[in-house]
Amino acid sequence: SVADSDDPDLTVVNSGAYWTLYYNSANGEYSLRMFGNVPSSIPSAWKSYLGNIKHIEIEEATLTGSFEAYFKSKIDGFRVLESVRIERSNLSGVTSFREAFFSAGIEKVIIRDNDYPTAPSLLTTESMFENCYNLTEFDVSGLDTSAVTNMKKMFYNCRTLEELDLSNLDTSSVNSMNSMFGYCESLEKLNVSNFDTSSVNDMYHMFRDCKALEKLDVSNFDTSSVTNMGGMFVNSTSLKELDVSNFDTSSVTNMSALFSSCRALEKLDVSNFDTSSVTTMLAMFVACNSLEELDVSNFDTSSVTTMQSMFFECSSLEELDVSNFDTSSVTTMQSMFEKCTSLEELDLSTFDTSSVTNMQSMFINCAVLKSLYLDNFTTAKTMTDMFTGTTSLAYLFVSHNLQSFYGLANTNWYDEKNWVQFSNLSQLQTYHRNQSEPTGYRKGTFLSLTMDAMGGQFDDAEEQKVQSKISGEYWEEVIPVKEGHYFDGWYLDQNFTNKFDFSLPATVSATLYAKWVENYTVVIPASISLNEATELKVEGINRGDKNLSVGLNRTATSVSESNKLTLANTADTTIQCLAPLSWDGSENNPKNAILTLAPGSEITEGEAVLAIEAPENIQAGTYTGNLVFSINYE
């Protein structure tokens, strides 16, 4: 700073009506002090010293006119200036500070405690501190900006500035804040919470590359007059919180790159955005890598002409509802969803692409996208790599007016409706070009399972049923019915040695055969010899849902009412004898069934014994007789 004039190291080098130039022999620095009526022109007497002056103090002075580029670093200007202090001065007559400190190596600017005896005349501070790479200390509390209309690039590229409190800056008349804080890469604190932005129409790149900002309070911004928000927060890579929910965007026409590369932003509420006037959404949400949710369902896109790279690299988004988008005016969708690596489904069935000429890389590297609906898409002039990298895409429902599938996996696909199989992409595209309506295609090889009921029937009375699946899916087990029989499973062979396992995924086409077992089984010995045995065992198995009973058929056998079997001599059938029969329950009821098996939750089995008493005191010879049994299942 300018030292006290009584400093013994300080020597007056030159002076004028409103200025004094000092040389400090202790540090070899030149300083300039101004006072009184200071004009906006630089006197020729300074010419030989401009390259040496490091400090300027303006105190108790009256400044008048345009100070545009006054302190600017240039060949014929202040080339080594480090600090400027303007205090206790009348600044009412200053009309411009445009580029006042542009590209200066200045480290410190203090403008405070100044007077405005009349209304301020200052209209522009455009680029006032642009490219002040070394600026670290800053105070403009004494600068009345109430009449300023242009603050474009005011702090642009102040790369080392870490903190900026502009809470008292009057912005009520400002029209342009274009790039106002652009490339303030080290800015960690920025207070703009009291900004009156009611007159602002241009916020293009306002906070561009404010890479160190984690918080920014713009919740009170009045954006009702803003038409340009292009790149407003672009590349503010550390920004974690941003409340724009109250933004009035009804006048905005440009939202290109609005939130581009806001990589740390985890939440963003744009659900109330009025986008009815917007014509470009180019790269609007590019590389918003941390956003897991984004509600754009209310966006009015009827005026939008470009959606290029709109959601490019929104890699954490798992869902995205764009079903209400009016895309009838859009001409380019290039890279619109490129690298949306968490999106599993995308429904663009309502998209009107009749005006679109460029779909290049539209879905490129959407690596987990499984389902894609393009019901109304039409062929665009440029479609290179449209589907490249959609390695997980398993379902594509697509308009017949979209003729080419550039980059789609060259593998097995099939028409899900007509079950037409394609072994490569070329076959698929050839087939699709002959379609007359939107068609759904699934990735994979479809398989068929033919189920032969083997004399049985399915619910539809058919004896055969065919299922169609793709590799990896699971077959459905369908059970047929057959009168008087029990279903014993599906087999891969008609010898019923290889039972089919429905718990395994489908891998090949196959034919299955139904195995049937009669609902019941009754086992009765064909013959017995009374010389060797006096009992006949009756065995039964009930597999069905009815009662099984086994008894004597009295109309077809020679058994008396008292259960005696007639045996005849084989040599002379007129010689006969009786063999008494008995079984459990026959004493009280001679007609009682020999064996009864009721149905159960599982297969039931049982047996009964029919006792045959050998006749005595009969004529010698061989005797035979027949027993006929009746089986009832009801």
State the predicted function of each range.
Residues 29-37, 51-63, 76-95, 104-123, ...:
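Structural signature of tandem-repeat unit edges
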Residues 32-34, 56, 346, 372, ...:
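Extracellular/surface recognition and adhesion modules
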Residues 422-444, 492-513, 593-598, 614, ...:
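Serine/threonine-rich, repeat-prone extracellular segments and beta-strand-based repeat modules
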Residues 517-572, 596-634:
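N-terminal small/polar-rich segments of proteins
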